Amino acid sequence: MKAIHAQVLAAHGGARGIRDEALLESAVAAPQATMMGQPLMSDPIEIAAAYLFYVCRNHAFIDGNKRTALAACLVFLESNALLPDAKLPTEQWEEFVLDVAASKVDRDETTRRLRHLVSHFEKAERSPHSAIRNST
């Protein structure tokens, strides 16, 4: 997560540093939590949503929490082949992240909205017109 944060700040600017190491550890550990040796989350969308939710809400970094949260989510989705190689609908993702940061949605709703964004994005990628959009 620290590497993602450093890349976000290098690309977009902002103050470096961790405000609270324990909150950062908590945000990273939550999606990896287990009970009796079994992961509490196994669905990749739910795990990506948890990274987005906890990194965004815990505000462990001095600056760039929302950007880092979204980047972590997108990196996780991409590493699980759930993020097509195309332009993301920026306005929808921005609204989504701002809602998470403003406590307008809980973790379950974060998962539902992420699932909707990813499925909507996948449908757009499969549409007959997507090849035209992607070739321009």
Task: Go through each PLM region and give its residues.
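FIC/Doc superfamily catalytic core
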Residues: 1-136
